Regions:
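Conserved, helical-rich catalytic subdomain that frames metal- and/or nucleotide-binding sites
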Residues: 221, 226-377, 392
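Contiguous, small/hydrophobic- and glycine-enriched helical/loop subdomains that border
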Residues: 185, 189-226, 233
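Glycine/serine-rich anion-binding loops at beta->alpha junctions
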Residues: 141, 167-196, 214, 377-391
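Residue-level signal for inorganic ion chemistry
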Residues: 11, 40, 148, 181, ...
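Conserved hydrophobic/aromatic beta-strand scaffold that supports enzyme active sites
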Residues: 2, 39-41, 224-226, 246-248, ...
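ATP-binding N-lobe of GHMP and related small-molecule kinases
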Residues: 1-176, 194-203, 239-241, 251-254
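Solvent-exposed alpha-helices and their adjacent loops that cap or buttress functional pockets
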Residues: 32-33, 210-211, 217-220, 237-242, ...
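Generic non-transmembrane alpha-helical segments
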Residues: 150-158, 204, 208-211, 355, ...
């Protein structure tokens, strides 16, 4: 089975309070975005599909054949390793932390091997899972710790799953606040449910997904949803943005960790009401005096957006960040979303911008540049670094 995943955007993101369990309660509107996505293939049995073979060829790696049904995984590793990397590879300890094991998300690990840094493979200790991850920019994480592997494992705790091979080509940006990894996990759950005839409905799948990540459950439903709690409490929400074109921009060389984004953020519950937790005015000063005007070709910060919608930041914008304006207390997201889109600029806020923009002022410059290019609304998605803008068609 082959599926194409998608990512998400956040329309507004309020950090409400810190909970006793260390997580934060949030409120946001998740919206599917199909501009980016990964390619996921799951195969039961021993055959390699035409697609998986093409994946190995694309990354100039010889496809190794792994048969999990005839002997122990350890006995078969040497041939597989030699086929993959041209020689034996030392086994790597892949066990998760005790905290993850308590969550039931850990996958007993046996071996991970890498080919040229762009394609990695891992085999579970029991030999039932082989996972291959490929990415042009390189894969610097262990495949057996990937959320796709954890999705298989969490279902395997309750169901007798057959041996499978998972092939994942990462094409969506990593560390951009678009939820690409969470989407991979959710689509893995859905694919395994169908392939293995588990008969789980979306509600049950979302319960498994919520154990893997705060925004994983959204991708089970994959329609506009208001997320609360950690993001796993979902409520359908009807919104019509058909009058607007949405541009998603991925700044080059800027990745933001969620932990970094939360560092220094002040939850809204402890703030006075009626004010907003946003940075003050940001001004973009383009090299071209006319670049900040509205242009039909939508030059962003003096630079045209390329054909993929990506903005490569080249220093044309000089950012000037004023003092943060007074922070805001609790607001009702539905009330804000009901406003005309033209009023969202001053009311629909991503609270992470306050901390992330301080650490990465170039993102503030890009956001201002989006408004300079006639965007009706612009925001960072999730904890960044991706930004998006709505333009009137």
């Amino acid at each position: 089975m082959i599926v194409k995943t998608n990512v998400k955007l956040n329309l507004g993101l309020s950090v409400l309070r810190k909970r006793a369990d260390g997580f934060h309660d949030i409120e946001t509107l998740f919206v599917p975005c199909y501009d980016f996505g990964d390619t996921l293939e799951i195969i039961t049995g021993d055959d390699y599909s035409r697609t998986s073979a093409a994946l190995f060829a694309k990354y100039d790696a010889p496809a190794g054949h792994f048969d999990a049904s005839t002997s122990s995984a350890t006995d078969k590793l040497s041939d597989w390793q030699e086929a993959l990397v041209g020689g034996p590879v030392e086994p790597t300890e892949l066990s998760e932390s005790a905290k993850d094991e308590e969550k039931g998300a850990a996958l007993p690990g046996n071996v991970a091997a890498s080919y040229d840094g762009r394609l990695v493979q891992g085999i579970s200790e029991d030999g039932k899972l082989m996972i291959t991850i490929a990415r042009e920019e390189g894969v610097d994480w262990n495949p057996l710790k990937d959320l796709c592997a954890k999705a298989y494992n969490i279902l395997a705790q309750d169901f007798d799953l057959p041996p499978v091979k998972i092939f994942l080509e990462k094409e969506a940006p990593v560390g951009a606040g678009l939820g690409g990894g969470s989407a991979d996990a959710a689509f893995t759950l859905k694919a395994l449910n169908e392939l293995c005839g588990l008969g789980l409905d979306d509600q049950r799948l979302s319960e498994y997904a919520s154990k893997l990540g705060s925004d994983c459950a959204f991708f089970i439903f994959n329609r506009p949803m208001i997320g609360s709690g950690r993001g796993e409490v979902l409520e359908p929400y009807d919104i019509n943005l058909s009058e607007y074109e949405i541009k998603v921009l991925i700044p080059e060389g800027v990745a933001v960790s969620t932990a970094e984004a939360y560092r220094g953020i002040v939850p809204r519950e402890g703030l006075p009401s009626g004010r907003s937790d946003r940075l003050g005015e940001q001004k973009c000063l383009p090299e071209d005096p006319g670049a900040s005007e509205c242009h039909e070709n939508r030059r962003i910060g003096g630079q045209p957006v390329n054909s993929t919608g990506m903005l490569m930041v080249g220093g044309h914008c000089q950012n000037k960040i004023g003092d943060p304006v007074e922070p805001t207390g609790m607001t009702d997201l539905k009330d804000v979303l009901a406003m005309p889109v033209a009023e969202w600029k001053d009311n629909l806020v991503n609270d992470f911008e306050a901390t992330v923009f301080k650490a990465h002022p170039e993102l503030a410059a890009i956001k201002q540049s989006l408004y300079d290019s006639c965007a009706v609304y612009a925001s960072m998605s999730g904890s960044g670094s991706a930004l998006f803008a709505l333009y009137k068609k």
